[in-house]
Amino acid sequence: MCMSEMTTSQAAELLGVTPRQVARMASSGRIDVARRVGRTLLVDAGSVHRLVRQRRHPGRIWTQRTAWSALSLLSGSDPVWASSAERTRLIHRLRRMAPEELTHLSANRAVVHRFRGDSEATHDLPNYIAVTGSSATRHPLWQRFELTSEPTGVDGYVPASELEPLVDHFHLVPDPAGEIALRTTTFESAFLGGHTPWAAVAVDLTESLDTRESRAGHNELTELLERMRQHDR
């Protein structure tokens, strides 16, 4: 076992949970799977330490509804499902927020499902989902990240009701270590024109295990939050 991997027992000790809970976190995508050795599940140490850092931030994690309200506001869109009072409260809170806190509070924005698939799935799937993270290379604001490497997998959001049809259509196989990440959400209204809100793209990048991608996402969130503070002056 290399230093970039750890057992579920080691991860559980760091997180203060049970190995079974760590396995569930890996299954849901909150922790990345490194590989399996027989029946032993090895998780990515970097993703465990990232989760440890997130848990240091105070505040109860937002519901999907609130998370998408905040991410839409930060992206310059109007969350029509939120009341005027809710939007005002969120704006005031965002103006006092750091990127790390935003990432922590919006952790429930979707449920992550990982799969493996063939080359056809990797090539065509982005046309059926709202791409995000390193897969959002065609977003009109992508150049702001200054990232040049091509994505190796697929990352994107889908309505919860469309997950099963997509899995069947592309013959995807559930795999905790798979390079296809489908994030199911119940807030389709947040995806104007079928696009992921820009702030969500940045948040997803901050959670990347690639240092350059994570830094690019963090820097963009810093800029977006600063712009919101500027509007208050």
What label would you give each PLM region?
Residues 4-9, 80-91:
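Short acidic, hydrophobic short linear motifs in intrinsically disordered regions
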Residues 3-5, 38-42, 153:
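A generic structural signal for beta-strand entry/edge sites
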Residues 92-233:
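Phosphate-handling catalytic interfaces
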Residues 47-83:
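A short, Lys/Arg-enriched interface patch at domain edges and termini
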Residues 1-25:
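Polyanion-binding surface elements
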